[in-house]
Structures are given as structure tokens and as C-alpha cells.
Amino acid sequence: MDTLLPAFIDAEEQEQAQEIRTFLKEQGADLKEESITPLQDELAEILECCQVCFKEDAELESVMNSILSLVLVVPEKRNELIKKCCDKLKANMSEDENSSAAARLRVLSVLFSGLPEKDPMRHEVYCTQLTIAAKASLVDDIPTELELVKGWLGLWDVDADQRRQVFRLLHGALHDEKRSEEASKVMIELLSTYTDENASAAREDAKSCVVSCLTKPNVLIMDNILSLKPVAVLQGDPIYQLLQIFVSGDVQDYKKFYDSNTDFINSIGLSHEMNLKKMRVLTLMSIGKETDEISYEDLATKLGISSDEIEQFLIEAIQTGLVKARLDQVHRKVIISSVAQRTFGINQWQNLHSRLVKWRDNLLSVRGGLQSVVPPITV
């Protein structure tokens, strides 16, 4: 299907290009009056000075949409011209020109839609959208859903470096807008693109990712981060030791680490009190894997709190959705019904497989029993 974009005038391609050239020259562009051929060379020359129409949003959109409608039909140098369009739209973005950012994004949105969904040049266009939106605080004006973006990257068949470029720009845009939850997910996706061979290049990104997850009160399970190649490169660093404690340690492990690394904890902006709250919930989750009940006194000792604080702590732990438990106030015990897995490795997969097989066998047994007492239905 042919791509249709808004046009400056309704005319043949070369005539449209001549009209755009004339208009830009009238706006002060350093252009000759005579058009040149072939069309791709004409468009390249026009794009060199198209910024003269960026003063007014209406002119910017009209002229750039018309140029792009021609770019998409040229037989040669199409990708080169699209890149030049993107470069022009993201250039000259001084603070006092941010009012035109919305218009630039609208032009890019039209271009993005005008390209086939599997066209690799959509990558260039989307990166330009992210750059402009981040600079002008207009991130809400463009699509940023991680699953959608990952789907696009699969369609465009881009390489690892191009994927990283998108994830890095997307993370920066979301981070600047204080959308930290989404930004963290994007950073994890970015780190997952690295291999053993190049993981060391993402060392600082890995540190940033770990700190970001540790600072979030609602993020408690982090074994997925520990398995990322760039995070593994951090082994031996205090940040890696701290992450290991949050993945599989307990309150006492954290307290020992804090006593030896207080300055480090403070330097990366972590709250000691928040860390303790998270570690207490994580410790209870580990306890719940070993036993289904524990006395107030024993639990208080393991968590480093008083027995009087157990009730309030349990309420907060249950609110995380990772623990199901109740108080037995008569016998001063905590009864633990279930807890989430802190880590999910090969042992957990094998256990899940065994449980599913047992469930399947039970269902087959029930079906066999029913078939033995209920006559088959004939039609």
C-alpha cells in the first residue's frame, strides 16, 4: 500500500519540491531559485536549510510533512534523507525554542506512521522522538510502554547496539520524568542485552540499576537482577555484596554489612531504615520456607525488633503481597500460611514441575473415577 503524508501542495513531485524551494527562499533560506534533479538531490539541498520554517508551528508542520511525503517516494537515498530530516528536527532545540517541540514530535509521529511497520528506519525516527520529548519534557506525548517498544525492536530486526540505544534513551526520558518504576524496568532490559564479552562496558549502568531497585520500597525480590551479566561484573564491589544480602541474606547479615559500610550506604543515597524494613520482610519470607509457625520472641530476635512491634510488622509484611500469615495471640505465635520465593532457580523449577505433574495425575485420577460411575454420553 502506498504511503500517504500531508502534502504542501497537490502537484507532481518535482513541482512540489520547486514550490518548497521557493517558499524557503522567501523565508530567507540560502537557496538558488532553480530546482535540481534528480529529486533526491533536490530534497537533500532543501533539507540543508529547512530550519528557516521552524519559527511557526504551522509552517514547520506543513513544510516538513510535505518534504517527508516526497522523501518516502524517492527511489534512492531515502534512508539518508530520513536521517537528515531527523537530524534537522532534533537540532536547534534551545530552551526558548521548546515551544516548537510538540510540532516536531507531531511531524515525527506522522513519519513514523508513514513508514512500514517493519521498516528499520523507524528506529531512527523513534530515537529522535525520545531525544526531543526528553529535552522538552513531553515524554507523555510519545509511546513509551516497554512491551510495545520491545515488539517494535523485534519487527525492525535491529542489532544489539541499536537496541541499547533505544533502551538508554527511553530510560533517560522516563528517569527525567520521575517515572522511576518504568525506568528501572527499562534499565533491566538494557542490561539484559549484554553478554559475558561486553558486560564490563555496562558497569556503571549495572550499579545504577542495583541502587535504583534497592531504593524502591515495593521492590523486594531481586534475584532477576543478580543474574544479569553486567551485574555479575560487580562481584567484589560493596554494591554486589549488598545485593546478595537482599537476595538471600537476613537482617543480621544486613546489620553486619551496614556496620562495616555505613559511609557507603549513605553515599549511594540508601535509607538504612528502609533497608531494615525490607530485610525484615525478606527474613520472614525465608523463615516461612523453613517453618509454618514461630513464637513472637524468636521472630522478634531474628528481626531485631521488640515483641510489641510484631503485630504492626506483620500487617506491613502482609500488605506487600509476599506473605500470608496471622497472629495467634493466645499462644503468642505467628502462623505462616505461605510466602513468595525470594529466589527462583533450578530447584524451584523442578519443584514446580513436580507439583504440576502431581496435579495433572490427580485430575486424571478424578476423571477416571467419574468415567467409571457415569455412563458415557452418546449423541
From Swiss-Prot:
<feature type="domain" description="PCI">
    <location>
        <begin position="179"/>
        <end position="341"/>
    </location>
</feature>
<dbReference type="GO" id="GO:0016282">
    <property type="term" value="C:eukaryotic 43S preinitiation complex"/>
</dbReference>
<dbReference type="Pfam" id="PF01399">
    <property type="entry name" value="PCI"/>
</dbReference>
<dbReference type="InterPro" id="IPR016024">
    <property type="entry name" value="ARM-type_fold"/>
</dbReference>
<dbReference type="InterPro" id="IPR000717">
    <property type="entry name" value="PCI_dom"/>
</dbReference>
<protein>
    <recommendedName>
        <fullName>Eukaryotic translation initiation factor 3 subunit M</fullName>
    </recommendedName>
</protein>
<dbReference type="GO" id="GO:0005852">
    <property type="term" value="C:eukaryotic translation initiation factor 3 complex"/>
</dbReference>
<dbReference type="InterPro" id="IPR036390">
    <property type="entry name" value="WH_DNA-bd_sf"/>
</dbReference>
<comment type="subunit">
    <text>Component of the eukaryotic translation initiation factor 3 (eIF-3) complex.</text>
</comment>
<dbReference type="InterPro" id="IPR040750">
    <property type="entry name" value="eIF3m_C_helix"/>
</dbReference>
<dbReference type="InterPro" id="IPR027528">
    <property type="entry name" value="eIF3m"/>
</dbReference>
<dbReference type="GO" id="GO:0002183">
    <property type="term" value="P:cytoplasmic translational initiation"/>
</dbReference>
<keyword id="KW-0648">Protein biosynthesis</keyword>
<dbReference type="GO" id="GO:0001732">
    <property type="term" value="P:formation of cytoplasmic translation initiation complex"/>
</dbReference>
<dbReference type="GO" id="GO:0003743">
    <property type="term" value="F:translation initiation factor activity"/>
</dbReference>
<dbReference type="Pfam" id="PF18005">
    <property type="entry name" value="eIF3m_C_helix"/>
</dbReference>
<dbReference type="GO" id="GO:0071541">
    <property type="term" value="C:eukaryotic translation initiation factor 3 complex, eIF3m"/>
</dbReference>
<comment type="similarity">
    <text>Belongs to the eIF-3 subunit M family.</text>
</comment>
<keyword id="KW-0963">Cytoplasm</keyword>
<dbReference type="GO" id="GO:0033290">
    <property type="term" value="C:eukaryotic 48S preinitiation complex"/>
</dbReference>
<comment type="function">
    <text>Component of the eukaryotic translation initiation factor 3 (eIF-3) complex, which is involved in protein synthesis of a specialized repertoire of mRNAs and, together with other initiation factors, stimulates binding of mRNA and methionyl-tRNAi to the 40S ribosome. The eIF-3 complex specifically targets and initiates translation of a subset of mRNAs involved in cell proliferation.</text>
</comment>
<keyword id="KW-0396">Initiation factor</keyword>
<dbReference type="InterPro" id="IPR045237">
    <property type="entry name" value="COPS7/eIF3m"/>
</dbReference>
